[in-house]
Regions:
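Activation segment signature within eukaryotic-like protein kinase domains
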Residues: 121-122
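Conserved N-lobe ATP-binding subsite of Hanks-type protein kinase domains
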Residues: 34
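AlphaC helix of the protein kinase catalytic domain
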Residues: 106-116
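Conserved short submotifs of the Hanks-type protein kinase catalytic core
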Residues: 92-106
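AlphaC helix of the eukaryotic protein kinase fold
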Residues: 55-76
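Protein kinase catalytic-loop region centered on the HRD/HxD motif
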Residues: 127-137
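Activation-segment/catalytic-loop signature of the eukaryotic protein kinase fold
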Residues: 88
Length: 200
């Protein structure tokens, strides 16, 4: 894959992705991806995550696509407390994942709220993590923004982009045996991972 085979694919409200999904809202944007709220021909809402390969150096496109495909497969685990991946495709050489749309926002407003719902939410998060772990997956990106609420109020884990597979090593190591890549958000990393980053 090279620059000539990847098109720039930015979408505005009202435009169609692959003549199938109509964009109704931009939900978020990350380093290499953008998430849209889209509707299909039956007017059903979904979240569509587009990997913007046109912004990525050619030499890292292949490993990035491999990780994106693994994200899709992780999202196919059948559990009510995980945001489900429903479709995978490409547009202009850029891959996308279509997922359940969660209309209830994320966990952030509950932090420090003292809400009586928190014990149930924690239970649902743990069930989601258990579903991942029993299939050899490690989320590695658990934070309030990655816990979404479905329309029925159920909490579900999302964003499996940096999820690990206990049966595969995707983290490169340097000549000293230390990881070259550290996955996760610093503020939510366990102390032992932060200590490894510091060389302790």
């Amino acid at each position: 894959m090279n620059n000539r085979t990847v098109d720039r694919c930015d979408y505005n409200v009202g435009e169609y992705i692959n003549n199938r999904y109509r964009v109704s809202q931009t939900l978020g944007e990350g380093s290499f991806g953008k998430v849209y709220r889209v509707t299909d021909s039956a007017s059903k809402d979904y979240a569509l995550k587009l990997l913007r390969l046109w912004e990525v150096p050619p030499e890292i496109r292949k490993p990035l696509m491999e990780r994106f495909e693994m994200e899709f497969k992780t999202g196919q685990i059948d559990c009510d407390y995980l945001v489900r991946s429903l479709d995978y495709g490409t547009v202009g050489g850029n891959p996308y994942i279509v997922m359940e749309y969660c209309s209830g926002g994320d966990l952030t407003p509950y932090l420090g709220s003292g809400s009586s719902k928190i014990p149930l939410i924690c239970q649902q998060i743990l069930i989601g993590l258990h579903a991942l772990h029993t299939r050899g997956k490690v989320h590695r990106g658990l934070k309030p923004e990655n816990v979404l609420f479905k329309s029925n109020g159920i909490a579900a884990l999302t964003d499996f982009g940096i999820a690990g597979d206990r049966n595969k090593r995707m983290t490169e190591r340097n000549i000293f045996g230390k990881p070259n890549q550290i996955f996760g958000t610093y503020a939510y990393m366990p102390p032992e991972q932060v200590n490894r980053m510091r060389g302790e």
